[in-house]
Amino acid sequence: MKNQFYNYIEGLQDQITSSLEAIDGLAKFEEDLWVRKEGGGGRTRIIQNGAVFEKGGVNISKVHGPLPPAMQAYFNVGEVDFFACGLSLVIHPKSPMVPTVHANWRYFEMYDKEGAIVDQWFGGGQDLTPYYLFEEDAKHFHSVCKSACDKHDKNFYEDYKKRCDEYFYNSHRNEGRGIGGLFFDYCKANDTMDMEQWYAFVTEVGDSFLEAYTSIVEKRKNLTYTEAQRDWQEIRRGRYVEFNLVHDKGTLFGLKTNGRIESILMSLPAHVQWVYDHHPEKGSEEEKLIEVLKNPIEWAASA
């Protein structure tokens, strides 16, 4: 399973970076191959200062070896070996009319002293963070997510959409980071799904990513915008940074376990603002976005 999934994310990384380069038309992804001394490594690809994408990363990694002490405590296990691989991406567009997107698909195994698998699971998801709310874009993104889920279980979309809204929530601001999507974790073999079926589901979601996101980018990338709208984008990006550094389990975990800092922090945007006690004007497009972030909508149901 681990080789099957790693081969899949290698191919998916190629597909996604090629597609985004074609949309941008100016910038290319730079590749950084790195090695983890305890075992494994990764292939980081970063795009910067493009015509469409200001900064973004599409990274894959495959790490293995003894489970670090912090992870032993987290999983409540003793000294065991592990394997983990995944693809993680964050794309920050230049235009405030184009939403930021995040996605992650991952697989984890734990072994006993004889090397037999004692636990294994998939996790992942994809979510959208707009700066200006185009309802048709929100409906499209969620409809694609729902379509991918429905092929495997009619309850998945509702469950994983709810988890996404709950997870990507800035509790200190009382608002969501974005308009959600899917979030799932600890997808283990059970009475209704074996690991091959979970693999089929997770790869279905991965394969849906470009359909969910790129048509939105194409539709919005040439819209005009003002300096004030760009300021709003940078203020909202500040909320993105707050979530990633204050609440995100993956970021905090990486920082606590001596993870690769460049890969961990690649999710942060290049230009951000924090304006003291900032509030959008009443009745403005900016306020409309905030209302939705505070009160999540069932986008797929209204599509």
Which role fits each region the language model picked out?
Residues A138-E227, D231:
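Extended, acidic-biased charged interface segments
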Residues T257, I261-A303:
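TerminUS-proximal long segments
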Residues F83-G86, Q120-D127, E175-E196, Y240-E242:
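Glycine-rich, often proline-containing surface loops adjacent to acidic residues and nearby aromatics
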Residues M71-A73, M193, L252-N258, Y276:
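Short conserved micro-motifs at the rims of enzyme active sites and ligand-binding pockets
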Residues M1-N76, N190-Y225, R230-Y240:
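Gly/Pro-rich turn-and-neighbor structural signature
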Residues T44-W121:
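Internal mixed beta-strand/loop scaffold within catalytic domains of large alpha/beta enzymes
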Residues Y111-D159:
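Compact, glycine/acidic-enriched structural inserts
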Residues R230-Q273:
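C-terminal, helix-dominated tail/subdomain
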